[in-house]
Amino acid sequence: MDKKEIAQGLSPFVMMAFVDAQNLETGFLTRHRINKLTKEQIMGFSMETEKIINKLSHQLEQVADGNIPTDHECGTIFQYVFDKVTEALYKLLMGDEVDTQFNLKEAFDYHEPDLPEYIQLKLTNVVGKIGLINMKILHYLDENNARTNDYDSWLPAYLMVAVIIAIQFAQEIDPDDDSEMQAYLDN
């Protein structure tokens, strides 16, 4: 599969994140955007994020020494990208300075998004679903012999799925709703 075919093949995995009868295990997005971005804003943010994703891919390729990343390594990076994009977009939507940095080493160390705790809890509550989507994508890539040591052919498209899901997720976050945190504290 070439780069374009891989990207096209991965696009349906974004839909797994939406609540739907077909996505009982993976759905968490409702399409109810509290903080809407214009298409132009989304495109601009996506293009900037794509540059960052390409840099991360090249960094990983350099340190991997020709080895294909394991499921665990891929999942860690996928979740990291989801968290960091959510963080950056949340800050943008709240009118805060977007000072979010993407650092490959940080993905494998403990990192805590620079977000209020109740927003971090919203992220924590979808980790399992993000993990399932990630595993389904990796299965698809492996089934099609697309996960190779030619990182440029598959890794950016794979990570862009996390980016697209995070863009929708960040727009659905209600900054005034801390009910998940209250429920957590009550238990």
Please describe what each predicted stretch is.
Residues 183-187:
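Short acidic DE-rich linear segments
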Residues 2, 37, 41-44, 48, ...:
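Conserved aromatic-histidine-acidic binding/catalytic patches
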Residues 23-26, 30, 44, 51-154, ...:
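Long, low-complexity or tandemly repetitive, helically biased scaffold regions used
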